[in-house]
Amino acid sequence: NHVDGIEKGGELWIKGPNIMQGYIMPDNPGVLVPLEGGWYHTGDVVEIDEIGFVYIRDRIKRFAKIGGEMVSLNAVDEMVRKAYEWMGGEFDYGVVAVPHESKGEQIVLVTNNRHVEQDVLHSYIRNNGMSELFLPRIILFRDKLPVFATGKADNVTLKKEVLEELSAKNSVAA
């Protein structure tokens, strides 16, 4: 299915006897809410090649909608990694989208590396023909970022923490 702002691919919908029948909602226990037309919306952005292989490229929820354009937060993650490859070593960072008054959303980069600078990221974007939309508008520094026991980034907790921090800063500025 087409996803606004995604040029190649779309959202994967699946249907079949092995797919769940629907959802049981907490506000109406015991009542099954069937899937629309029997189709399950996976939330995965996929591309299908010329011979029919399906490639999962991203998650719909890992996008920022900035001024009507969809920006992949995974692509921003990758851009940050590549922009700082020259430093060697590992550092932690996460990218989240938060509300923006006029543009819909904005990208926030959170890292434990105090050498990460917007100028370096901006140069990387410019030198690699990327859109300015990929540039994080805010960079926050933390000693530790939230992760699951597996070591994978906990983006839900990170976004919550970022929203709390930005809200506190706006309260002080007001």
Language model segments and positions:
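Conserved ATP/PPi-binding loop(s) of AMP-dependent carboxylate-activating enzymes
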Residues: 1-33, 69-71
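Short, acidic, Ser/Thr-enriched surface-loop or helix-capping motifs
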Residues: 7, 48-49, 147-148
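AMP-binding/adenylate-forming catalytic core of the ANL superfamily
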Residues: 16, 21-22, 43-134, 151, ...
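Short, small/polar residue-rich loop motifs at catalytic or cofactor-binding pockets
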Residues: 35, 40-42, 140-141
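Short proline/glycine- and acidic-rich turn/helix-capping motifs at secondary-structure junctions
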Residues: 102, 138-150
